[in-house]
Amino acid sequence: MLLWLIIFVSGWTLSLGSETEPDFTWHLSRIPQVVSEKTIHLASPTFQADAAAVKATVCGIECQEELPAPSLSQLEDFLSYETVFENGTRTLTRVKVQGLVLEPTQNSSIKGARPRRRRQVYGTDSRFSILDKRFLTNFPFNTAVKLSTGCSGALVSPNHVLTAAHCVHDGKDYVKGSKKLRVGVLKMRNKGGRKKRRGSRRSRREAESGGQSPEHPQESTTQRPGKKSRRGPRVAQGRPSFQWTRVKSTHIPKGWARGENGDPALDFDYALLELKRAQKQQYMELGVSPTISKLPGGRIHFSGFDNDRDDQLVYRFCSVSEESNDLLYQYCDAEAGSTGSGIYLRLKEPGQKNWKRKIIAVYSGHQWVDVHGVQKDYNVAVRITPLKYAQICLWIHGNAANCAYG
């Protein structure tokens, strides 16, 4: 009951303030279009990179303030993208940006009311483990997924998961295990300790073999000698377990997948995974990230699978302290495993009384950033800007015609 009050009542109390309250509404506007120009076949990756939270030191908000705004050709290069398929083949798609008005200004930052703090879990842990199936199997918590590489992600369509790029690629190569990448969705078990399974025998075998938790690879059921069992381990009735689905293809912006041409840019630490099987639960739509002043209470929300809470979905909310054009610094208590989670807001629908949640950033994790020549680590999220919205929308729909507004 306490969790319910925290999640839902907070939105109602915003309307009880003064008449000068900000307009917390999703405002749709025409955005630039990212259009595919040509696709080039590349050599297959080796899938030998080690999965890590971040590669070296990245350019954070203070570092970005000293950089000039990128040109149109640079943006088109950053937004061009790699696609790697389940059979190991890889392509590079060059894009063109249409309808963009460039502003000849440097990257700017906006500071919140509070000074930033170094990352850790402070005093009383403010995270909530979602254990009640009434929450766990319902929106918005059922949009959170787990990657077999150890990260989290968010379902943004029946067939697509948004996550952090570093969960599958270190900037030079794809990480070990990403060639047979799987996505796990928490499901409740039915009577008898098994979840319902539909579809072909082949897809069931994939789900069951993939459903073996990476943390417990040796679990198995008793079987007759000489006969292979296709059935996964039994789970106690009423307990959630992961249903695993193979990833069909992975899209990563060239701003992150630099190869030998440079270090990955933190601004582009996001990736989209296309699943082999559509998911039936409700997904969360994308939204363009508003400024701090447009956040109700200055807060953001996200749920993920923190490593210190074994296979539990963990929810948290916190304040944003500072933002640039592409990044957010925030105070959320989080541990490894939650990176890649979709950060969302709850704002009003235009012209309606209804409130709607949308994903406006991807949690990149505890990153080492360059702050005036000194290395410091902070909680960082990558904002979904109009251009990134257009790019991710192109990945989801396959054409720019469906991505005119965001």
Curated annotation (Swiss-Prot):
Residues 186-204 have a biased composition (Basic residues). Pfam families: Trypsin. It is found in: Secreted. SUPFAM superfamilies: Trypsin-like serine proteases. Disulfide bonds join 151-167. Its main location: secreted. Residues 186-248 are annotated as: Disordered. GO terms for cellular component: extracellular region. Keywords: Disulfide bond, Glycoprotein, Secreted, Serine protease homolog, Signal. The keyword Coiled coil does not apply. Residues 1-17 form the signal peptide. The keyword Endoplasmic reticulum does not apply. Belongs to the peptidase S1 family. This is Inactive serine protease 35. It comes from Rattus norvegicus (Rat). The lineage of its organism: Eukaryota, Metazoa, Chordata, Craniata, Vertebrata.
